[in-house]
């Protein structure tokens, strides 16, 4: 049994060594020669897995340690009898932490009260749904656009046009689709970007091409009232440095890169592979996760709620460090810049999630307890 895996997938040996030989490669370097003898292929979003890659190979199981599947040719898998698995929700918490950290940074820059803003979440799947729960748990006003869920479930959804018209913050969490009525390719094009409310904050931690990057750069140059946070880029790992310069925060597709999320993704495809083989699971993620660097935060009950929110979130993650590292990596040399983009992701420092944090409140405070519950942390 030969298992070919992206070298950046964590815990591959711990989860898969019992099944056969493991060969690891850079994700962008996986090609036909790499998989010509492989039985199992384990990838991330940087590897396009399609007929051209797999035809003639013995691969019968493909696992991707990602939520999205736009890099997988699912039609070919069905035709070729290939079983596949993604890792739905594996990094949802990490992306939510990224968005919260971005909001705190924007609020400090502009001196605004986050509780007074209207939030628009586009896409209510694993990530968007988790973000909606947190924001509403904090008591904030949230509007949601998700045409597919609206058609299937009904409920309290708004159109994208209504959301753009009414919201001060737009956070994108859609998959990337290029066809059909609900295509998300350039969902925010020049026309829609020009319709953003005065002072809107735009956050894209979904897929780069969901926003027309060239149009966004032009609109940001024309409208100094707008603020943008980009974690994903239309041509990544190539990045338009001039667009990054226009963003308040710019990062190299690491919004969901928590240690918990990455290892959870590996665990999920391991579980799927065990089901494929009809075997019982022998390895548990809980036994492999290390203790967090900051296990607990203590607050007095008289702490200001807005300050407490920032303290809890930043005890776990602050995106400004990733922003600084990314900006230092930008270069006019395209090859150097592409290599640096992948290098930042490959050597990303350990980062944990808010729901692994314990918060001790000295005294009683309903407001602080509500914040802790909304964030998903544990109150001691």
Swiss-Prot record:
Compartments where found: Cytoplasm
This enzyme's EC code(s): 1.1.1.290
Active site, UniProt feature: 207, 236, 253
Domain of life according to the entry: Bacteria
Major site of localization recorded for this protein: cytoplasm
Pathway: Cofactor biosynthesis; pyridoxine 5'-phosphate biosynthesis; pyridoxine 5'-phosphate from D-erythrose 4-phosphate: step 2/5
Classification via PROSITE patterns: D_2_HYDROXYACID_DH_3
Cysteines joined through disulfide linkages: none
Residues that hold substrate according to the record: 45, 66, 257
GO cellular component: cytosol
Keywords annotated in UniProt: Cytoplasm, NAD, Oxidoreductase, Pyridoxine biosynthesis
GO process terms (BP): 'de novo' pyridoxal 5'-phosphate biosynthetic process; pyridoxine biosynthetic process
Record-listed NAD(+) binding positions: 146, 174, 231, 256
A GO molecular function held by the record: NAD binding
A Pfam cross-reference name: DUF3410
Catalyzed reaction equations: 4-phospho-D-erythronate + NAD(+) = (R)-3-hydroxy-2-oxo-4-phosphooxybutanoate + NADH + H(+)
Task of the protein: Catalyzes the oxidation of erythronate-4-phosphate to 3-hydroxy-2-oxo-4-phosphonooxybutanoate.
Family of this protein: Belongs to the D-isomer specific 2-hydroxyacid dehydrogenase family. PdxB subfamily.
PANTHER family: FORMATE DEHYDROGENASE 1
HAMAP family attached to this UniProt entry: PdxB
Subunit (UniProt): Homodimer.
Protein name stated in the entry: Erythronate-4-phosphate dehydrogenase
Organism, scientific name: Pseudomonas fluorescens (strain ATCC BAA-477 / NRRL B-23932 / Pf-5)
Classification lineage: Bacteria, Pseudomonadati, Pseudomonadota, Gammaproteobacteria, Pseudomonadales
Name of encoding gene: pdxB
